[in-house]
A protein has these predicted regions:
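OB-fold and OB-like single-stranded nucleic-acid-recognition modules
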Residues: 2-135
């Protein structure tokens, strides 16, 4: 009987810990890239750096605050209703994909030049930047 009570208490404690971490801790304890010093670069230069040498670009940009300036190619929404921007040159093999951190509407239009600050998380076919905030 003691064994069953111990297992139930352990499962309840584990569930409570998971709930706290998922819904409370992770909402309040996250990185504030806007307060960090950032690397300032154009969208074209950033995507070119990753195309030229991905390892070298990762050592310079990966998990760092980056302030990117470039032309907006598209504006979309992701599954979490966050605005996503694609910046760079039309027809280029690789561009910069930015997910904005807030759900506020964007006033800029496709074709306009914009500066966004966020955290570079690497490159797939495009360079990925998360937690972006329009400057």
């Amino acid at each position: 009987m003691k064994k069953i009570i111990f297992i139930l208490v352990f499962i309840i404690a584990l569930a409570a810990s998971f709930y706290y971490y998922t819904f409370v801790y992770s909402k309040t304890h996250h990185r504030d890239a806007q307060a960090e010093a950032s690397v300032i670069i154009t969208a074209d230069s950033l995507s070119a750096a990753y195309q030229l040498d991905e390892q070298k670009a990762n050592t310079r940009f990966l998990n760092k605050a980056v302030e990117v300036t470039g032309t907006i190619l598209s504006i979309d929404k992701d599954q979490a209703n966050h605005t996503t921007l694609l910046m760079g040159k039309a027809g280029a093999f690789s561009n910069v994909s930015i997910t904005l951190s807030s759900t506020q509407p964007i006033t800029q239009k496709v074709g306009e030049t914009i500066t966004v600050k966020g955290v570079c998380t690497g490159s797939l076919s495009d360079v990925i930047i998360n937690e972006g905030v329009i400057k």
